[in-house]
């Protein structure tokens, strides 16, 4: 297969690459055959290989970088609250590609970048409230690709998620590999990710010995957390835990504190991002009166992962490995 050896050599032990650009086809993209992909359950045809992709948010941007597609990007938008980007495997991508906005994408900055594809997701850039949607961009002649983790699932007007979160990552890597002519690179990444996760799964506890985990993103009046279709669901399960919100048929959503208390998690995982630091979130949780009887709080079992670890991104396998190592130290009550 084309580029298999190159792709394999570029992969690191974490199945991510630093400084290994994809061997993107150099033929006239305008004359290349159209590519039809299934995206959010719909057949979408792209007439040509995009040259000026604009992305929204860190996980989506790093999917492009992991595929070595920096040269196909016109820029990205994301807040500057995503931690230190100088030590990540895709440092060169961040240095090379223009940071268009520290806010969400808008039609104006997409048009200014002369984008020929927008790669974003529902609540990861796309939003109904001000009309920044794939349909609106289509009217401007700009195609879109929607992050699979964020696909609307039809259970309610805003509920998201149509497949297990890691499967969503593999789907997007495979689809984009096909669109950009880097199928071998995508296949090598997916294979590497699956192997690393399988290695963690093999060490995980089973059955009743699996710690129960609550993902805390933010919120004091009502916590913002992860249901069964958000990336933390599968990150937790592959690491050897059980998401206490597994039965919530949504991706990212709010619940009541009474639900957290009732489900009595053994561990709380904090999503580190935004103006409130992980340490501040931890202090709040450990001192929030309704939680004083919760096992995780009584035993001070709080683990921190970065935002990009917990949204669909090529950092998910590393997050599984780190959380798995922590959960193996937890004695089930």
Where do the language-model regions lie?
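Bacterial Sec-exported substrate-binding components of ABC uptake systems
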Residues: 2-12, 16-63, 175-215, 327-333
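Short helix-initiation/N-cap motifs at beta->coil->alpha
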Residues: 39-41, 97-108, 128, 248-257
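A short, structured surface patch at a secondary-structure boundary
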Residues: 57-113, 117-118, 122-126, 244
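Solvent-exposed loop/turn segments at secondary-structure junctions
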Residues: 59-62, 79-82, 117, 123-127, ...
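Extracytoplasmic ligand-binding site segments that recognize negatively charged/polar headgroups
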Residues: 82-84, 124-132, 142-175, 208-231, ...
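Short helices/loops that flank or line small-molecule/ion binding pockets
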Residues: 106-117, 132-135, 255-264
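Structured C-terminal subdomain patch of bacterial secreted/periplasmic proteins
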Residues: 163-172, 247-248, 269-333
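Alpha-helical, coiled-coil/dimerization segments enriched in small aliphatic residues
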Residues: 225-252
């Amino acid at each position: 297969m084309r580029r298999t050896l190159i792709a394999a050599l570029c992969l690191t032990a974490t199945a991510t690459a630093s400084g290994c650009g994809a061997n993107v086809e150099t033929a006239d993209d305008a004359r290349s055959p159209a590519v039809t992909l299934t995206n959010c359950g719909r057949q979408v045809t792209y007439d040509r290989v995009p040259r000026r992709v604009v992305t929204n948010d860190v996980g989506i941007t790093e999917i492009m970088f992991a595929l070595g597609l920096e040269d196909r990007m016109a820029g990205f938008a994301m807040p500057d609250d995503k931690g230190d980007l100088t030590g990540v495997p895709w440092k060169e991508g961040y240095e090379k590609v223009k940071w268009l906005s520290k806010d969400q994408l808008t039609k104006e900055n997409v048009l200014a970048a002369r984008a020929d594809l927008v790669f974003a997701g529902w609540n990861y850039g796309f939003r109904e409230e001000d009309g920044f949607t794939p349909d609106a961009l289509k009217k401007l002649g700009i195609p879109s690709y929607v992050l699979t983790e964020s696909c609307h699932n039809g259970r309610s007007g805003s509920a998201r998620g149509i497949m297990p979160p890691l499967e969503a990552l593999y789907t997007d890597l495979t689809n984009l590999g096909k669109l950009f002519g880097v199928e071998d690179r995508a296949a090598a990444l997916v294979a590497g990710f699956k192997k690393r996760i399988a290695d963690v799964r093999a060490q995980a506890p089973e059955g009743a010995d699996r710690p129960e985990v609550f993902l805390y993103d933010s919120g004091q009046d009502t916590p913002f957390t992860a249901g069964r279709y958000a990336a933390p669901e599968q990150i937790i399960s592959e690491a050897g835990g059980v998401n206490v919100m597994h039965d919530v048929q949504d991706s990212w959503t709010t619940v009541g504190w009474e639900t957290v208390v009732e489900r009595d998690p053994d561990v709380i995982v904090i999503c580190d991002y935004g103006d409130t630091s992980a340490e501040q979130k931890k202090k709040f949780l450990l001192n929030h009166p309704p939680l004083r009887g919760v096992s995780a709080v009584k035993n001070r079992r709080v683990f921190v992962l970065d935002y990009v670890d917990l949204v669909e991104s090529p950092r998910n396998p590393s997050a599984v490995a780190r959380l798995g190592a922590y959960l193996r130290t937890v004695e089930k009550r």
